[in-house]
């Protein structure tokens, strides 16, 4: 049986995700989301890696096995809050001389948009963003049954009036409807060459500008639903002249259109009353069609929801979401000397040693080792370190080394214990080399192939160290020179993976 996942389902999914991040109504979220960075050594021989990563980046693998490994190779995370998540739409810049498409409720495979041949409204070019970051929807582009693609736009819309209007005096036939202005903070966080940010909480916000647009689009308040009647066929043999007003029939009420008849043909149709409650409409030309030899076809264009501007998520098709995270500042959770090849979005990681959801602004998911200030050698990011410990040898990959604080951060993933680095193929020595050992707070040196060598500062138990005359916070608390991650390794649900 034929079936389809609808556009409205996609829009709903995006809205549900935003609500999950921000909390319903924007308060007291019960979930915690983090953008994480990981995999600093993607080109070595190892599980989930490839020597050609930097030139031919592989597609992410979505299964439990790979997700578990991502948990082991993650470096750190930054929390995403309601201020840092937005719905998105495709960016369509206004450019003089470009032919845009008008909003229509009936684009389909059988009746695609005339310029881009899009079967979906949301794939067509029916809205623009101008140089001032104002977003407008195209109510009319001068198109009709005898000019199906409309005209090239000559006048950039810049007005912020509530009612649809032409943008200038060129006569290009365009009528634009102002929707909103992208805020300066959203420009800084979310602007890109591909997408436009859409404000959160459109349907409930008390922001004066948005509220005015929303209420102007509420036909229950102002009987202002329909803005355009499209002349698909002018017909012939119609009586009367210019300025004749007719009712718009259908399942709504109050809609009226003023029609001009010239030479028996309908040459113009302008809404005089938008009405309310329409999901379809038909113009009642019964008083002038008695002698019509060719029947006219006038199509009332039905806005989404209650009217243009009432619900921009439905109007613009906000089926994408962007999360913004800024890694920087003095936060020691984010080492600046590392690399990363994967970006993830993780939901509800748990605090180390507990089952409680982690809610702090950021976290380190790496183990840390504090070396004495006299340590002079420096390891290479991504290389293997090792230490002789009780029962065997502890091994790990270097994620970061702070030359000032002498803190080394490392991770341990399955590649260290697979004989070939990649899978479970048996090998000689597996009984000892296949076991995972933790680094220990002993005098036994930690070494690396680059020549790095140093011993744990076993007397260091603090989250602050002294560098010269400064006290420097380390982001984690050490006990006898060792520190655990701030979250349980691999905890939380990975809902997005991006290989870089």
Predicted segment positions?
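Tryptophan-rich substrate-binding surfaces of secreted polymer-degrading and adhesive proteins
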Residues: 1-221, 293-297, 387, 392-396, ...
